[in-house]
From Swiss-Prot:
It catalyses: D-threo-isocitrate + NADP(+) = 2-oxoglutarate + CO2 + NADPH. Pfam families: Iso_dh. The keyword Metal-binding applies. This is Isocitrate dehydrogenase [NADP], mitochondrial. Substrate binds at residues 166, 183-189, 198, 221. Binds 1 Mg(2+) or Mn(2+) ion per subunit. GO terms for cellular component: mitochondrion. Its cofactor is Mg(2+); Mn(2+). It comes from Aspergillus niger. Keywords: Glyoxylate bypass, Magnesium, Manganese, Metal-binding, Mitochondrion, NADP, Oxidoreductase, Transit peptide, Tricarboxylic acid cycle. Its EC number is 1.1.1.42. GO terms for molecular function: isocitrate dehydrogenase (NADP+) activity; magnesium ion binding; NAD binding. The keyword Manganese applies. InterPro entries: IsoCit/isopropylmalate_DH_CS (IPR019818), Isocitrate_DH_NADP (IPR004790), IsoPropMal-DH-like_dom (IPR024084).
Length: 498
């Protein structure tokens, strides 16, 4: 039985079992499974207790006994050595080196616990270095837990991250925070550097909002600088705005920016040649790995020096390092203006990598995710050019709206697929670095189980059912019901390989 990997080849892969009609209710086999499971599977709202972001979410005694200090430093790790999985005869797989686990907030925190306890720990003997990035604990540690987590990823090489809250004014008031802390993703990216790559999870049974997209579109987002490290301020009244650069061994150079006649706003931002070069190398390497052409897009016609620097560095590195490899694989690299590239992207069938600046990549990755069917079907990985650090997470947020429903005791149907893939992509990287193919195979089998439950059995969460045009209640299941189906499918797939 072959494993599933998500690349250009996956988009062309045909499944052996035909997908059910999109307008039909769940298949009879799916209904039988859910009916037989109803005595043990309840809605997520009744099965998982609401927890404060400050508390650990693991149901295991190991996690519940951790101290606050251990949550911060990650020194207290999971060392589970049971020889068999629950209710199965499948041997546990040893993960050679640790994986850094970054917990998160709200609905995704609850789902994260379920994934860890039901789909990861029963099958893997893994040392998890745990850091609680829940908003309240970040506030308690003055956000040092985020810095420590990033340093741990540097040390161990691989991290998996749950979605987290980036506070705004309303969140500061809600959580009574000391201050409006920065985005933990931004903090981690600025410490690790590298490039964020977002790739769709393609499920043939889920129709695309952009129907022509038959091949993956991978967004490479430069994970450093620009607006995300900008200094901005409100200008209170008339005055002169200037930009001053002072060389280490030279006289200050002053550039006039604007003469304000009244109030306004101003912003300065920056990037570095070193970071742009790393971005270029990571982008070219990803394109070669996936066997796809690469497009780099900027607005260099307007930002002639700023965006022009990106364009020039990419071209220089392509010609000096990667052109021969691209041509040997019949691939190409091209710079295109961002507005032209976005228009061409919508008209295309997919099948390429886009290298984008920080803000452009942030926006376009969500557009691509929704175009392929759902924000819940998009992976996000942070990759450094030399491969010394790798972090994977879901591309979506903490699903606050579902969490509010959960707090009221109502059932929720939150798509966990991207969060599951955050674990699997991290495990695949860990297995590759450690040269442990059984770890890679397990992660690929878990990904395959997620896809097959939707594609072959018609069991899906509400967002995917709506994408299929199915609004009736019987068309979708709760989060825990979906994950129970994935667990069943995973066990069957693993047993068939023994």
């Amino acid at each position: 039985m072959s494993s599933v990997r998500f690349s250009s080849a996956l988009a062309r892969r045909s499944f052996a079992v035909a997908s059910p009609p999109l307008s039909a209710p769940l298949s009879s086999s799916a209904r039988r499974f859910l009916s037989s499971s109803s005595s043990t599977i309840s809605s997520s709202s009744s099965s998982v207790s609401t927890r404060s972001p400050r508390s650990l979410t693991s149901a295991s005694s190991l996690l519940s006994s951790r101290t606050a200090s251990a949550r911060w430093t990650g020194l207290s790790s999971l060392n589970l050595t049971q020889s068999r999985t629950m209710a199965t005869e499948i041997p546990k797989i040893k993960v050679k080196n640790p994986v850094v686990e970054l917990d998160g907030d709200e609905m995704t925190r609850i789902i994260w616990q379920e994934i860890r306890e039901k789909l990861i720990l029963p099958y893997l003997d893994v040392d998890l270095k745990y850091y609680d990035l829940g908003l309240e604990y970040r506030d308690q540690t003055d956000d040092q837990v985020t810095v420590e987590a990033a340093e741990a990823i540097k040390k161990y090489g691989v991290g998996v991250k749950c979605a987290t809250i980036t506070p705004d004014e309303a969140r500061v008031e809600e959580f009574k925070l000391k201050k409006m802390w920065l985005s933990p993703n931004g903090t981690i990216r600025n410490i690790l550097g590298g490039t964020v790559f977002r790739e769709p999870i393609i499920i043939p049974a889920i129709p695309r909002l952009v129907p022509g997209w038959n091949k993956p579109i991978i967004i490479g987002r430069h994970a450093f600088g620009d607006q995300y490290r900008a200094t901005d301020r409100v200008i209170p009244g008339p005055g002169k705005l200037e930009l001053v650069y002072t060389p280490v061994n030279g006289e200050p150079e002053t550039v006039k920016v604007y003469d304000f006649q009244g109030g306004g706003i101003a912003q300065t931002q920056y990037n570095t040649d070193e970071s742009i070069r790393g971005f270029a190398h990571a982008s070219f390497q990803m394109a070669l790995l996936k066997g796809l052409p690469l497009y780099m897009s900027t607005k260099n016609t307007i930002l002639k020096r700023y965006d022009g620097r990106f364009k020039d560095i990419f071209q220089e590195i392509y010609e000096s390092t990667y052109q021969k490899d691209f041509e040997a694989k019949n691939l190409w690299y091209e710079h295109r203006l961002i507005d032209d590239m976005v228009a061409q992207m919508i008209k295309s069938e997919g099948g390429f990598v886009m290298a984008l600046k920080n803000y452009d990549g942030d926006v376009q990755s969500d557009i691509v995710a929704q175009g392929f069917g759902s924000l819940g079907l998009m992976t996000s990985t942070l990759v450094t050019p030399t491969g010394e650090a790798f972090e994977s997470e879901a591309a979506h947020g903490t699903v606050t709206r579902h969490y509010r429903e959960h707090q009221k005791g109502r059932e929720t149907s939150t798509n966990p697929i991207a969060s599951i893939f955050a674990w699997t992509r991290g495990l695949i990287q860990r297995g590759k670095l450690d040269e442990t193919p059984d770890v890679v195979t397990f992660a690929e089998e878990l990904e395959r189980a997620c896809i097959e439950v939707v594609n072959d059995e018609g069991i899906m969460t509400k967002d995917l059912a709506l994408a299929c045009g199915r609004k009736e209640r019987e068309a979708w299941v709760t989060t825990r019901e979906y994950m129970a189906a994935v667990e069943r499918r995973l066990k069957a797939n693993l047993k068939s390989r023994l």
